[in-house]
Protein backbone atom coordinates (compact mmCIF):
# COMPACT_ATOMS: atom_id res chain seq x y z
CA UNK A 1 0.00 0.00 0.00
CA UNK A 2 1.49 3.29 -1.09
CA UNK A 3 1.20 6.80 0.31
CA UNK A 4 -1.54 7.69 -2.18
CA UNK A 5 -3.62 4.75 -0.98
CA UNK A 6 -3.24 5.91 2.62
CA UNK A 7 -4.27 9.44 1.70
CA UNK A 8 -7.42 8.36 -0.13
CA UNK A 9 -8.45 6.01 2.68
CA UNK A 10 -7.59 2.67 1.08
CA UNK A 11 -9.68 -0.11 2.57
CA UNK A 12 -8.35 -3.60 2.02
CA UNK A 13 -10.99 -6.30 1.54
CA UNK A 14 -10.82 -9.47 3.62
CA UNK A 15 -9.74 -11.41 0.55
CA UNK A 16 -6.96 -8.94 -0.25
CA UNK A 17 -5.78 -8.99 3.36
CA UNK A 18 -5.92 -12.78 3.42
CA UNK A 19 -3.87 -13.01 0.22
CA UNK A 20 -1.27 -10.59 1.59
CA UNK A 21 -1.04 -12.56 4.86
CA UNK A 22 -0.93 -15.88 3.00
CA UNK A 23 1.93 -14.73 0.77
CA UNK A 24 3.88 -13.40 3.77
CA UNK A 25 3.26 -16.67 5.65
CA UNK A 26 4.56 -18.67 2.69
CA UNK A 27 7.74 -16.55 2.65
CA UNK A 28 8.17 -17.14 6.39
CA UNK A 29 7.59 -20.88 5.94
CA UNK A 30 10.19 -21.13 3.18
CA UNK A 31 12.64 -19.23 5.42
CA UNK A 32 11.90 -21.84 8.13
CA UNK A 33 10.38 -19.20 10.42
CA UNK A 34 7.59 -21.62 11.29
CA UNK A 35 6.20 -19.86 14.37
CA UNK A 36 5.62 -16.68 12.36
CA UNK A 37 4.31 -18.65 9.37
CA UNK A 38 1.70 -20.46 11.48
CA UNK A 39 0.42 -17.21 12.98
CA UNK A 40 0.21 -15.51 9.58
CA UNK A 41 -1.46 -18.51 7.92
CA UNK A 42 -4.06 -18.68 10.70
CA UNK A 43 -4.77 -14.96 10.32
CA UNK A 44 -5.20 -15.45 6.56
CA UNK A 45 -7.48 -18.46 7.15
CA UNK A 46 -9.67 -16.40 9.49
CA UNK A 47 -10.11 -13.72 6.82
CA UNK A 48 -10.67 -15.99 3.79
CA UNK A 49 -9.82 -19.71 3.70
CA UNK A 50 -10.11 -19.77 -0.08
CA UNK A 51 -7.01 -17.64 -0.78
CA UNK A 52 -4.76 -20.72 -0.92
CA UNK A 53 -4.34 -24.40 -0.21
CA UNK A 54 -2.82 -23.93 3.28
CA UNK A 55 -0.82 -27.12 2.62
CA UNK A 56 2.27 -25.75 4.37
CA UNK A 57 0.18 -24.95 7.44
CA UNK A 58 -1.02 -28.56 7.56
CA UNK A 59 2.64 -29.64 7.51
CA UNK A 60 3.34 -27.37 10.47
CA UNK A 61 0.60 -29.03 12.50
CA UNK A 62 1.77 -32.50 11.48
CA UNK A 63 5.47 -31.99 12.22
CA UNK A 64 4.97 -29.58 15.16
CA UNK A 65 6.81 -26.78 13.39
CA UNK A 66 6.00 -23.49 15.11
CA UNK A 67 2.98 -24.99 16.85
CA UNK A 68 1.87 -28.01 18.81
CA UNK A 69 0.63 -31.13 17.05
CA UNK A 70 -3.10 -30.96 16.29
CA UNK A 71 -4.36 -33.99 14.38
CA UNK A 72 -7.86 -32.64 13.74
CA UNK A 73 -6.61 -29.27 12.49
CA UNK A 74 -3.99 -31.00 10.35
CA UNK A 75 -6.68 -33.23 8.82
CA UNK A 76 -8.99 -30.26 8.20
CA UNK A 77 -6.25 -28.28 6.44
CA UNK A 78 -5.07 -31.29 4.44
CA UNK A 79 -8.62 -31.98 3.26
CA UNK A 80 -8.97 -28.31 2.28
CA UNK A 81 -5.76 -28.48 0.22
CA UNK A 82 -6.79 -31.79 -1.38
CA UNK A 83 -10.16 -30.36 -2.41
CA UNK A 84 -8.22 -27.46 -3.96
CA UNK A 85 -6.42 -30.05 -6.14
CA UNK A 86 -3.06 -30.21 -4.33
CA UNK A 87 -1.57 -33.67 -5.22
CA UNK A 88 0.64 -34.05 -2.12
CA UNK A 89 -2.32 -33.10 0.07
CA UNK A 90 -4.42 -35.75 -1.68
CA UNK A 91 -1.77 -38.34 -0.85
CA UNK A 92 -1.55 -37.19 2.77
CA UNK A 93 -5.35 -37.18 3.07
CA UNK A 94 -5.37 -40.76 1.85
CA UNK A 95 -2.93 -41.70 4.61
CA UNK A 96 -5.01 -39.87 7.23
CA UNK A 97 -8.24 -41.58 6.12
CA UNK A 98 -6.58 -45.00 5.99
CA UNK A 99 -5.17 -44.64 9.51
CA UNK A 100 -7.81 -42.46 11.19
CA UNK A 101 -5.32 -39.65 11.80
CA UNK A 102 -7.44 -36.70 12.95
CA UNK A 103 -10.59 -38.23 11.49
CA UNK A 104 -12.77 -41.32 11.35
CA UNK A 105 -10.98 -44.15 9.52
CA UNK A 106 -12.43 -44.65 6.03
CA UNK A 107 -10.33 -46.89 3.80
CA UNK A 108 -12.68 -46.64 0.80
CA UNK A 109 -12.47 -42.84 0.80
CA UNK A 110 -8.72 -43.09 1.45
CA UNK A 111 -8.26 -45.25 -1.64
CA UNK A 112 -10.18 -42.72 -3.76
CA UNK A 113 -7.88 -39.91 -2.64
CA UNK A 114 -4.79 -42.08 -3.23
CA UNK A 115 -5.92 -42.79 -6.78
CA UNK A 116 -6.66 -39.10 -7.39
CA UNK A 117 -3.15 -38.19 -6.16
CA UNK A 118 -1.60 -40.88 -8.37
CA UNK A 119 -3.57 -39.56 -11.36
CA UNK A 120 -2.03 -36.14 -10.62
CA UNK A 121 1.42 -37.80 -10.83
CA UNK A 122 2.27 -37.52 -7.13
CA UNK A 123 5.30 -39.84 -6.94
CA UNK A 124 4.63 -41.00 -3.37
CA UNK A 125 1.01 -41.79 -4.25
CA UNK A 126 2.05 -43.73 -7.37
CA UNK A 127 4.49 -45.78 -5.30
CA UNK A 128 1.94 -46.45 -2.54
CA UNK A 129 -0.78 -47.38 -5.03
CA UNK A 130 1.56 -49.77 -6.87
CA UNK A 131 2.53 -51.37 -3.55
CA UNK A 132 -1.13 -51.73 -2.55
CA UNK A 133 -2.07 -53.26 -5.90
CA UNK A 134 0.82 -55.72 -5.66
CA UNK A 135 -0.22 -56.72 -2.13
CA UNK A 136 -3.84 -57.15 -3.23
CA UNK A 137 -2.73 -59.32 -6.16
CA UNK A 138 -0.64 -61.52 -3.85
CA UNK A 139 -3.64 -61.96 -1.57
CA UNK A 140 -5.97 -62.75 -4.49
CA UNK A 141 -4.07 -64.62 -7.27
CA UNK A 142 -7.03 -64.17 -9.66
CA UNK A 143 -5.97 -60.52 -9.95
CA UNK A 144 -2.67 -61.58 -11.54
Predicted regions and their residues:
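Short helix-capping/linker turns of helical repeat alpha-solenoids
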Residues: 16, 47-50, 63-65, 70, ...
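Hydrophobic face of amphipathic alpha-helices that form TPR/SEL1-like repeat modules
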Residues: 24-27, 54-63, 92-99, 128-136
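TPR-adjacent "capping" and linker segments in tetratricopeptide-repeat scaffold/adaptor proteins
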Residues: 3-20
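Alpha-helical segment of the N-proximal tetratricopeptide repeat
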Residues: 16-46
Amino acid sequence: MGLFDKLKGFNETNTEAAKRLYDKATSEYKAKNYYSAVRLYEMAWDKDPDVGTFFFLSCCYYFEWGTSKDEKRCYELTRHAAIKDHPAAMNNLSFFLNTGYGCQEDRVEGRKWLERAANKNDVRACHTLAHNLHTEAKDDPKLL
